[in-house]
Amino acid sequence: MEKNVSQVTAQEETALKARGYNEDLLPSSPKQRTMGARNFFTLWMGSIHNIPNYAAVGGFIFLGLSPLQVMLAVVLSSFIVATFMNLNGVAGSKYGIPFAMHLQSTYGSLGAKLPGFLRGCVAAIAWFGLQTFTGSLALLIILGKFWPNFLEIGGSFQFFGLRLPELMAFTLFWLLNVAIGFGGSKILNRFTAILSPLIYVVIIGLTIWAIRAGGGLTPILSYQVSGAIRSVNPLVAYLIIFNSVVAVWSAPGASVADFTKNARSTRAQV
């Protein structure tokens, strides 16, 4: 544990509980700070590699930029996001406080309600819904491959535009995500440690397939979309990409203390 990592005394913890703070809002104890650099690496890599992100990056080439320019813009955007998250995460890694306490220390108990609502209801829930829906489609494809008749269950029944097989896959995938969330940081660390290497196996495999299918790196990096918007200024296109990447990471960036509060040190979360 770093020397500059602050710890809450028993008296301070008692005072916080008397003010209505539950166990989830209390600063992490030294025993709870178990996340090292490897845990954060697998956590963020797992968050980066997902289908909605790939679809968004693929759509950027319609702004009139080449694939190489899009890659450069995404890398620069990632540096901006990483800098913001590292700086904002110090509050959690140093004091062991979660996002809710971080907000209250800045805006007060009343002032913290609005940013907490915006982060929770607008950013987190919307993004969670998108990821869950996308994951459920992947699960539906897998179930359809092993059990083709599953795709015919329910006939023409629909619920908010979802057929019964789609609804079942969505519910199953949603329950899996909720179960992992209720498991806490220990379950999350174990899950990401197992899943992240598998993600890289898939990514490397897809990369090899894409290079072969595209005829090599040179044709891929020089590819121009026929339906691209040619009227967009390149600088404006870069700004659009910057804004898109930063917006995607606004929720985890704002609430990064929920993760860094369990960091062994500030160096580990950086």
Q: What does each model-found stretch correspond to?
A:
Residues 1-68, 214, 232-240, 261-268:
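Membrane-interface "cap" regions at the ends of multi-pass membrane proteins
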Residues 28-32, 45, 59-61, 100-106, ...:
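Helix-loop junctions at the membrane interface of multi-pass solute transporters
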Residues 36, 97-125, 156-166, 264:
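Transmembrane-helix boundary/entry motifs in multi-pass membrane transporters
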Residues 58-90, 111-114:
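Extracellular loop-to-transmembrane helix junctions
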Residues 61-64, 89-91, 106, 114-116, ...:
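Membrane-water interface regions at transmembrane-helix termini and the short interhelical loops
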Residues 74-107, 119-133:
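Juxtamembrane transmembrane-helix boundary signature
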Residues 113-155:
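Hydrophobic transmembrane alpha-helices that form the core helical bundles
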Residues 136-145, 177, 198-226, 241, ...:
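Hydrophobic alpha-helical segments and their helix-loop junctions in multi-pass secondary transporters
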